[in-house]
């Protein structure tokens, strides 16, 4: 078992919790509050913009040209490709996706997640720390979708089933490259450094759990500080 595989194994209990939580279970059944999906789409639009920016920041510290090309491709995918999955949710809501995300939200859970990733870009010269903070995002979505496609409770007649179909396959190439990078960049690390990278990965998996819950509860700042 390589290093990336151990991270994915260690994250599994958190992913199980994400799958069993309200947001994914109601999405699975094709019966979820429309306001929860609006909150998710608005927060995710903000999140993905920053995700693309972080990819751009990593370009100068990539180990080879192939990795740079990969990051450029991922920026393009975030800008153009992943909108398809969002459109399915917008169709369920019955509103235009671009109109939904015109209202900007910056909820606490999204804020903490994004800052966790930025911190690891700037705090460490080795890109493994930042990649460990970013890699759980596609992995969590892929694992949830693959599990959902085998779940008898999946409402295949709902437009929301297409959301699971999208993530069932679209994340696989990205996960493979991130895993390869993770293994390459941690190969000469000490056990202490590897444990720090592992902690980053697990923290981001918890951030994924909190992000879905943020959408379901329409999480807002309680004492000011909401970003416009």
From Swiss-Prot:
Q: Which domain of life is it from?
A: Bacteria
A Gene Ontology biological process noted in the UniProt record is: thiamine diphosphate biosynthetic process
Catalytic machinery residues: 137, 208
* Record key words, sorted: Hydrolase, Thiamine biosynthesis
What catalytic reaction does the record list?
4-amino-5-aminomethyl-2-methylpyrimidine + H2O = 4-amino-5-hydroxymethyl-2-methylpyrimidine + NH4(+); thiamine + H2O = 5-(2-hydroxyethyl)-4-methylthiazole + 4-amino-5-hydroxymethyl-2-methylpyrimidine + H(+)
Locate the residues binding substrate: 44, 141, 167
Annotated site (Increases nucleophilicity of active site Cys): 47
Q: Which GO terms describe its molecular function?
A: thiaminase activity
Q: Return the InterPro entries for the record.
A: Haem_Oase-like_multi-hlx, Thiaminase-2/PQQC, Thiaminase_II, Thiamine_Salvage_TenA
Q: Which NCBIfam families match?
A: salvage_TenA (TIGR04306)
**Subunit details:** Homotetramer.
What protein am I looking at?
Answer: Aminopyrimidine aminohydrolase
């Amino acid at each position: 078992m390589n290093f990336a595989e151990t991270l994915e194994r260690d994250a599994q209990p958190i992913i199980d919790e994400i799958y069993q939580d309200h947001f994914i279970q109601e999405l699975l059944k094709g019966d979820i509050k429309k306001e929860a999906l609006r909150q998710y789409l608005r927060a995710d639009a903000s999140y993905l913009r920053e995700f693309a920016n972080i990819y751009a920041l990593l370009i100068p510290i990539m180990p080879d040209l192939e990795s740079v090309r990969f990051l450029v491709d991922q920026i393009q995918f975030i800008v153009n490709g992943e909108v398809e999955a969002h459109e399915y949710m917008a169709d369920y809501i019955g509103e235009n996706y671009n109109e939904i995300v015109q209202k900007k939200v910056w909820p606490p859970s999204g804020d903490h997640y994004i800052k966790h990733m930025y911190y690891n870009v700037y705090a460490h010269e080795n890109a493994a720390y930042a990649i460990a903070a970013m890699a759980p995002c596609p992995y969590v979505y892929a694992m949830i979708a693959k599990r959902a496609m085998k779940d008898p409770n999946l409402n295949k007649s709902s437009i929301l089933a297409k959301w699971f179909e999208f993530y069932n396959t679209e994340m696989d190439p990205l996960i493979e490259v991130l895993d390869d990078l993770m293994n390459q960049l941690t190969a000469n690390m000490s056990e202490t450094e590897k444990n720090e990278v592992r902690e980053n990965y697990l923290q981001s998996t918890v951030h994924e759990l909190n992000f879905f819950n943020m959408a379901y509860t329409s999480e807002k700042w309680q004492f000011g500080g909401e970003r416009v």
